[in-house]
Amino acid sequence: MLRYSVGFDAREFAPWKEVDWAIGYIREHAEQWHIDPEQIVTCGFSAGGHVAFAAGLMGQNKPNAMVLNYPAVQLPNLPGVDYMIKLLTGKDTATEEDSQYVSLLNHVTKDAPPVFIAATAQDLLTPHGALPIAQKYSQFGTNYELHIFQYGPHGYALANEVSADGSLQNLDPAYAQWHELSVQWLHRTLGKPEHGEKNTSMLVKHMKQLGFLPADAEEKPIL
């Protein structure tokens, strides 16, 4: 999980730079952490989907695939977009050129990493994010998979007990299928990961140091 900058700390494209750095850092330590450097995937939701998508289109350390849930990719269509663009660019006044630059669809090419996209037809916040990505990818003949579920608001996350936070409104067995569907797609796209008898102690140790895991997290072998 990447704790990227938000609000005023997001100026000058800080979130984009941070996810790019994170991917590079993981690849640098791939052997030490028993990670396949060619099976790194970004996954993001809403604004996080924007960051995860930007990593694949704009970064120097591109992921091998991307999984996007109800991503915010067409910023000119979102409420408060001028403020968002000012934050990202660090400018007091956003120009049309700035607006087009942060609209990630303008950066899709035939070399874009494969992408899996999930969204709902009832999403009122980012209603037109998923379909245009699929259309762009189709235009370039690039690998993608798209799932539009009929029901559900913006922000379903996993749509199960893990992310529902006790709210029945955030439970939806239909939308919850996106996770397994994305895993199946990743296996078809990147191949299934090879599991061995390696221990994750070093990875867990570093994740504790970075604050991504609690200090008492157990060091278990990869199954």
Residue ranges of each PLM-predicted region?
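Alpha/beta-hydrolase-fold catalytic nucleophile elbow
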Residues: 3, 43, 67-70, 118, ...
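Acidic beta-to-alpha connecting loop that harbors the catalytic carboxylate
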Residues: 120-124, 151-153
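Short beta-strand/loop motif that positions the catalytic acidic residue
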Residues: 111, 116-119
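Alpha/beta-hydrolase active-site loop
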Residues: 10-31, 177-180
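Conserved alpha/beta-hydrolase
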Residues: 1-9
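Conserved alpha/beta-hydrolase "acid-adjacent" motif
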Residues: 124-131
